[in-house]
Amino acid sequence: MEWYPEAAANAERYTQIVWYK
């Protein structure tokens, strides 16, 4: 899984969703 700067910006919301589930 590669990580991009754009993903890092959405990492906060993405992490919340992944952590929530």
UniProtKB/Swiss-Prot annotation:
Tissue: Expressed by the salivary gland.
Keyword field contains Iron-sulfur: no
Record localization: Secreted
PTM info: Contains 8 disulfide bonds.
Main location: secreted
Source organism, top-level taxon: Eukaryota
Keywords associated with the record: Disulfide bond, Neurotoxin, Secreted, Toxin
UniProt entry tagged with the keyword Secreted: yes
GO cellular component: extracellular region
GO molecular function, one term: toxin activity
Miscellaneous information on this protein: Negative results: has no hemorrhagic activity.
Family recorded in the similarity comment: Belongs to the CRISP family.
Protein purpose: Helicopsin exhibits robust neurotoxic activity as shown by immediate death (about 8 minutes) of mice due to respiratory paralysis.
Name used for this protein in its record: Helicopsin
Species: Helicops angulatus
